[in-house]
């Protein structure tokens, strides 16, 4: 490969090439550093660029530094060193302005770039703005593809009357004929010469060579983002599945990896003509069932497009087995364990523990299926809880079996048999033919080269297809007019701001955070519709109602109906109890096939430590001005009057819940009550009884929102969080440190999280909550 590169470079030197291709309409050209400060408005990526030129036995150089919206250039010409500081910013998504200052000449220059279309760019630069002495006017077009750019520039000095004098015209052709291979030409009308340019892009670097009759130039650039890399053979890319994947990242102190970007990278990888296959190294990763199914479908699409997928794991489990179903081959470590074992859940029950302490937890609930408080008042599952959880696990298994059967092209009965007889040693798994071969980690490349009959295998990072980590080749920033705001509402619903748990890194859904996001979207004139992605077991009734109220104001305003914006809910793994409460008044509800929803019900709990105080010989005495002054004092067991009031408050909250569901879903109160009382429903059943409108994913919800907002069908949409990832989320540094420590000790993490969740019960309020968060898959 190195010999091939050196050969090509030697040919490039032979080409008669030249530099100084500074068309102000070319904002992200590899053929020029760019003298138009407006180019920094695109905030493409950081980088360092150096050029050295030999002209008439003299040597000149320049060094430029790009820091996003700002940059600097230091260059030497005619024995003089100059230093220029530049900056640019977007006025609109397609209009950019900029200015720079030359510290040696003490001159200010300004520039403009306007890209009305992705295939057209117009640029201008005025030198020495207070005493203008030179102007550049340029235009660029991309008639067929962003790999081919044609351009024209008019350049002229200016006299004292601001009139052009000795005008000159330049004509440009720049192309990337294949990934990372750059060829270009420039015609100088005044000199009547053609200048040729050529270069190579590597992952984070670029080499350009130029030479004309009088000069020769070489330049090298280093970039913070990934470039289209030069590679002649079709390549294999590498993906390591490790860590916690989630739909929304929470900034540099967040606890997870961006799942959306992973899926988008796979889709771009699938469409690329320069890729041959994907190698997946499965480490310790975790994600919800909805995310696992989405990843499985994305990998299946890659395989069905004709690309090879090799999945490697030391051990295996249910998640590995599903993902391997979408792979071409599953290779493993010989002495590993394939932990396929079905689906189950464990819920801790602590009534005897609390009794032994003398602590009494008084629970009032509506509906026999409202089982969230049972772990505090029972020693085992109630019949109703057992019925519901069994149904849930069987439905999860059914969806899982269907997916494995589809990917492996074997019968569902065979999949059930494999699950029923698990777990397995890897040797047993190979005998049963649901994995392929034994390979040590350092022999993966050797195995693939032998299987694919190729001489040598070099990997490229799948991150090349990650839009946030890749160089921006487009001439426009994404247009956000007629936008659809995607707001992620994830975790247990609490009052205040969202924040991460110090024990397991999970996010809680703060009403203040979600309401703020909704308000920003409602006021943003560019946002025409909102998609609320709900993944929550519920939580605080008060916090849930605050979010419901904010959605009501947006989707169903009382006064000015014209200000209404459609709100579409996309349910993830869970949207139950309070999670359903915040969804019920939206304009349309999508649930995924595995979504658990419903649990329309409410409960409340109070704590009494009267017997505990007796055990440790602490006596209490009291006085009050009124009969009920000591309501909810933990030192005493609740009186009959207090219990009656407590029950009445819970029943009032339940009536309010079903009334809002009835209004939002256009149902009768009795109808909602009959399917409520805490009962959970899988998505297909929820669709049949009217709790959701349709089975579909986040993309389906976005399309529906666009339709309700009357946005044209071909509008580009984004699944990135609005207004931005982590917006309004409180991330205490100590919580992050604590999570990093507890993540190494799963048992302590689980116990700590149970204690942490008790904060919900400490407030004087009612709860809408499930006893578990979601069925999570982990390696």
PLM regions and their residue ranges:
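Intrinsic disorder and flexible/low-complexity segments
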Residues: 479-520, 524-526, 649, 722-779
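Sec-dependent N-terminal signal peptides
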Residues: 4-13
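Feature captures outer-membrane beta-barrel proteins of Gram-negative bacteria and organelles
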Residues: 37-41, 57-76, 80-126, 133-154, ...
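N-terminal, post-signal peptide beta-strand-biased segments of exported outer-membrane/organellar beta-barrel
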Residues: 2, 15-70
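C-terminal long alpha-helix characteristic of the crotonase
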Residues: 403-407, 436-483, 603, 660-664, ...
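Charged, glycine-interspersed solvent-exposed loop segments at helix/strand-loop junctions
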Residues: 309, 347, 351-449, 560, ...
